[in-house]
């Protein structure tokens, strides 16, 4: 999910939280609603620090409404993530999860922020908790696989991706990730059909061609790698140029 879309979804969640809390109208709730609109406008205009300040003010104004305050911390955390301010996003997501312990999204996002800081074991624990809160939360389940991969636990990553493919047969990223995991484990030939399946589901994703090309190189099939590179060129010329350099280096070695 793209960061901007994620922020919009959180903003909608805030509005919903207000609608529930506003059953007992109060000045703090109305002020929080006003500040949410201020934050949304600031986000749209690219004034992210102003948006964060507005959300932080909501957490104070709506301190007596934990759900609203949690949503505000979550929104601020997502903006921090988009800005690459990962330590601050960790703090925001932790506050959101503390105020709303049932929020799988807050816990998952905490895991993503920890992952960006290369704190993979705590990140994995966060993803596992998010999945326990919501077993159907696709993003958290996928993040578990990615984190196992980063920890070098390829068998666990493979297991997660295979379960995702079983439960979500149209989830292209699971096929591609499984293919990459297999290639990294020295099983490049097994990876080929999963690369091809990922591309058949989502032919517009440049990374799928890049990864497939790398697997072809592992198999010594330079010609097929170059075919994927040419397909990639139509989608992402810069990525294709990088891949061309990788192929050329492999040919020289």
Feature annotation, model-predicted:
Residues 48-53, 57, 71, 82-95, ...:
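Structural signature of tandem alpha-helical TPR/SEL1-like repeats
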Residues 20-71:
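N-terminal leader/linker segments that initiate helical-solenoid repeat arrays
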Residues 61-65, 99, 133, 167-168, ...:
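Structural marker of alpha-solenoid helical repeat scaffolds
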């Amino acid at each position: 999910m793209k960061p901007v879309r994620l922020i919009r979804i959180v903003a909608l969640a805030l509005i919903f939280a207000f609608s529930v809390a506003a059953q007992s109208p109060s000045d703090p709730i109305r002020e929080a609603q006003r500040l949410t609109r201020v934050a949304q406008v600031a986000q749209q205009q690219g004034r992210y620090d102003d948006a964060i300040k507005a959300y932080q003010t909501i957490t104070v104004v709506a301190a007596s409404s934990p759900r609203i305050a949690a949503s505000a911390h979550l929104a601020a955390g997502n903006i921090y993530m988009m800005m690459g301010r990962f330590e601050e996003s960790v703090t925001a997501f932790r506050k959101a999860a503390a105020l709303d312990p049932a929020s799988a999204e807050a816990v998952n996002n905490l895991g993503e922020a920890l992952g960006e800081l290369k704190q993979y074991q705590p990140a994995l624990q966060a993803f596992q908790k998010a999945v326990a809160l919501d077993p159907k939360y696709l993003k958290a389940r996928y993040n578990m696989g990615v984190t196992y991969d980063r920890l070098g636990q390829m068998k666990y990553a493979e297991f997660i991706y295979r379960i995702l493919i079983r439960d979500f047969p149209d989830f292209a990223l699971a096929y591609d990730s499984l293919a990459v995991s297999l290639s990294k484990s020295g099983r490049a030939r097994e990876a080929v059909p999963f690369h091809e399946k990922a591309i058949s589901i989502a032919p517009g994703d440049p990374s799928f061609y890049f990864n497939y090309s790398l697997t072809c190189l592992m198999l010594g099939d330079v010609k097929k790698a170059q075919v994927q590179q040419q397909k990639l060129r139509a989608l992402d010329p810069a990525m294709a140029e990088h891949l061309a350099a990788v192929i050329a280096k492999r040919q020289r070695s």
